[in-house]
């Protein structure tokens, strides 16, 4: 399974590299704007680390509640689905609205919101993972979904604002591709692998199987939140270059 995962990822990475090289040959202007804009490049590197966490916690969220709170799949499905849908809706809409308001006052307003979203995702993620009661955990989970989706609109609009109008579809496509390669392809896989490692360790220490699986998954999900430091740091640097890159766009 591991070989197949990395083979598929390697093929995808090779295709992406070929696409970038092809863009450089076919459209030098597009290549320059996308890959030589420091603010845009830092953003494109930073954003997948957020989806690394959200895809991982999304993939193993139901299993976490089943293992740690002894809930049935149907109970988790109803509560988890409703909280995810409503919380994400509030996060996406509210994040976009607030991001536009911040942008009116600060040139880096949208980047500030994305960094706050990453920080809030870490705090609320720890909140729902380490709550002792299911009701408290699901309350944290609701706020987690608000925080973990609030950044999406600001990230997408920042990408399109840093390229010419004719290149917005290409830049958006690469943005989505980076989210998929870094987040969807690696987040659940690496977190699941870490969970298996912890589970084996706990079993070797004499912990019963159900408890070992519950604690192992909880620790793996909690430790995946550490990667949220990366986008906060990278976007902090991006704030230094955003205004200059926007000014150079139509210069």
Segments (PLM) and residue ranges:
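A membrane-interface helix-boundary motif in multi-pass transporters
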Residues: 1-6, 72, 107-112, 196-228
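C-terminal transmembrane helical hairpin of 12-TM major facilitator-type secondary transporters
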Residues: 107-158
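Primarily residues marking transmembrane-helix entry/exit sites
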Residues: 36-44, 134-138, 169
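Juxtamembrane intracellular "pre-TM" segments in multi-pass secondary transporters
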Residues: 1, 16-44, 68
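Paired intracellular helix-loop junctions of major facilitator superfamily
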Residues: 103-105, 159-168
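Extracytoplasmic gate region of multi-pass secondary transporters
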Residues: 1-3, 38-95, 148-152, 156, ...
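Loop-to-transmembrane helix entry/capping segments in MFS-fold secondary transporters
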Residues: 73-78, 165-175
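Multi-pass alpha-helical transporter architecture, strongest
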Residues: 122-131, 217-251
């Amino acid at each position: 399974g591991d070989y197949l995962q990395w083979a598929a990822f390697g093929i995808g990475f090779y295709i992406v590299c070929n696409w970038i090289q092809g863009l450089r040959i076919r459209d030098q202007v597009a290549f320059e704007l996308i890959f030589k804009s420091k603010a845009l490049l830092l953003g494109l590197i930073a954003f997948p680390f957020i989806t690394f966490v959200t895809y991982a916690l999304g993939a193993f969220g139901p299993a976490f509640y089943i293992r740690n709170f002894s809930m049935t799949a149907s109970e988790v499905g109803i509560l988890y689905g409703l909280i995810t849908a409503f919380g994400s809706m509030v996060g996406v809409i509210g994040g976009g609205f607030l991001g536009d308001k911040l942008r009116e006052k600060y040139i880096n307003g949208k980047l500030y919101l994305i960094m706050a979203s990453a920080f809030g995702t870490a705090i609320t993620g720890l909140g729902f993972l380490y709550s002792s009661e299911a009701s408290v955990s699901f309350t944290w989970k609701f706020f987690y979904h608000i925080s973990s989706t609030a950044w999406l609109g600001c990230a997408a609009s920042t990408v399109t604002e840093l390229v010419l109008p004719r290149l917005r579809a290409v830049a958006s496509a690469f943005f989505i591709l980076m989210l998929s390669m870094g987040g969807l392809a690696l987040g659940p896989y690496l977190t699941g692998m870490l969970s298996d490692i912890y589970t084996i360790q706990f079993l070797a220490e004499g912990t019963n199987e159900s408890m070992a699986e519950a604690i192992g998954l909880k620790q793996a999900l909690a430790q995946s939140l550490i990667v949220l430091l990366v986008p906060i740091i990278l976007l902090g640097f991006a704030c230094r270059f955003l205004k200059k890159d926007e000014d150079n766009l139509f210069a």
